[in-house]
From Swiss-Prot:
This is Protein Rev. Keywords: Host cytoplasm, Host nucleus, mRNA transport, RNA-binding, Transport. Escorts unspliced or incompletely spliced viral pre-mRNAs (late transcripts) out of the nucleus of infected cells. These pre-mRNAs carry a recognition sequence called Rev responsive element (RRE) located in the env gene, that is not present in fully spliced viral mRNAs (early transcripts). This function is essential since most viral proteins are translated from unspliced or partially spliced pre-mRNAs which cannot exit the nucleus by the pathway used by fully processed cellular mRNAs. GO terms for cellular component: host cell cytoplasm; host cell nucleolus. A motif (Nuclear localization signal and RNA-binding (RRE)) lies at residues 31-47. It comes from Simian immunodeficiency virus (isolate F236/smH4) (SIV-sm).
Length: 101
């Protein structure tokens, strides 16, 4: 097996691992709002995983003469991050427009 095929197999195994370690599709009790919120959070995590898998698949192979530390630093940028909560209030310019008739 050539090195490119081996690299492709390694990347595909990593992507498969990402898909296996994610949370399953949410099911269970709760109000309609709670179920909607759980599905929305699950969809957001799933979109992050798909984007991460795409970046892993399309990530260029590091040149052979590149130090391993540099390649590791580049790969550390590929991470799933928690999404911030949406703001609870409107920005100031929008508040001023809403108050004045």
């Amino acid at each position: 097996m050539s090195s490119t095929e081996e690299e492709l197999r390694r990347r595909l195994r990593l992507i498969h691992f990402l898909h296996q370690t994610t949370d399953p599709y949410p099911q269970g009790p709760g109000t309609a709002n709670q179920r909607r919120r759980r599905r929305r959070r699950w969809r957001q995590r799933w979109q992050q995983i798909l984007a991460l898998a795409d970046r892993i698949y399309s990530f260029p192979d590091p040149p052979v003469d590149t130090p391993l530390d540099l390649a590791i630093q580049q790969l550390q940028g590929l991470a799933i991050e928690e999404l911030p909560d949406p703001p609870t209030s409107a920005p100031e310019p929008l508040n001023d427009v809403a108050k004045s008739p």
